[in-house]
């Protein structure tokens, strides 16, 4: 049986830390589904379509990674994908605490689910989409925390926001 893992997130924007986890997951699993959440309640900087396009570009060198958007309950999405393994990145103790609570809830709703927590490589342990957005929204250069295509998209978004 092929091992399939779902790595969900808003990915607004996709960071170098995310890519590190995706790349490592692509080595560990036969198939990785990067599930980009619509998350309208979070008021994302990039639209779902933009986030999907950026993720596809970032992951183009990984043939066993599929990028897809979703707006339903993660449990339902996983069932649609016939996946029972969930990958979550954890950077800090507070991430672990929050993710452990989510894991307990997910397991209650889908008992056959396995949840894997994967810490980032050390150089990405402090990188988060929230911090990258904050840098970008204040006119800073977040390029060292994202891939070149995402850095260009952030610069374009900065110009767009400055003109509005």
Curated annotation (Swiss-Prot):
E.C. numbers: 2.7.7.3
Protein name: Phosphopantetheine adenylyltransferase
Phylogenetic classification of the source organism: Bacteria, Pseudomonadati, Pseudomonadota, Gammaproteobacteria, Aeromonadales
Keywords linked to the UniProt accession: ATP-binding, Coenzyme A biosynthesis, Cytoplasm, Magnesium, Nucleotide-binding, Nucleotidyltransferase, Transferase
HAMAP family registered for this protein in UniProt: PPAT_bact (MF_00151)
Record CDD domains: PPAT
Described function: Reversibly transfers an adenylyl group from ATP to 4'-phosphopantetheine, yielding dephospho-CoA (dPCoA) and pyrophosphate.
Pfam families membership: CTP_transf_like
GO cellular component labels: cytoplasm
């Amino acid at each position: 049986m092929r091992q399939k893992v779902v790595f969900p997130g808003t990915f607004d924007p996709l960071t170098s830390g995310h890519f590190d986890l995706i790349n490592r997951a692509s080595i560990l699993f036969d198939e990785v589904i990067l599930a980009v959440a619509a998350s309208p309640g979070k008021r994302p900087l990039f639209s779902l379509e933009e986030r999907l396009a950026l993720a596809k570009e970032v992951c183009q060198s990984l043939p066993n990674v599929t990028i897809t958007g979703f707006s339903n309950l993660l449990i339902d999405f996983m069932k649609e994908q016939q996946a029972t393994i969930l990958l979550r990145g954890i950077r800090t103790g507070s991430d672990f605490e929050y993710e452990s609570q989510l894991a307990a809830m997910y397991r209650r709703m889908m008992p056959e689910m396995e949840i894997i927590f994967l810490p980032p490589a050390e150089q990405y342990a402090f990188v988060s989409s929230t911090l990258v957005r904050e840098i970008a929204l204040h006119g800073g250069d977040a390029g060292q925390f994202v891939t070149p295509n995402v850095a260009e998209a952030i610069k374009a978004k900065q110009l767009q926001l400055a003109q509005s």
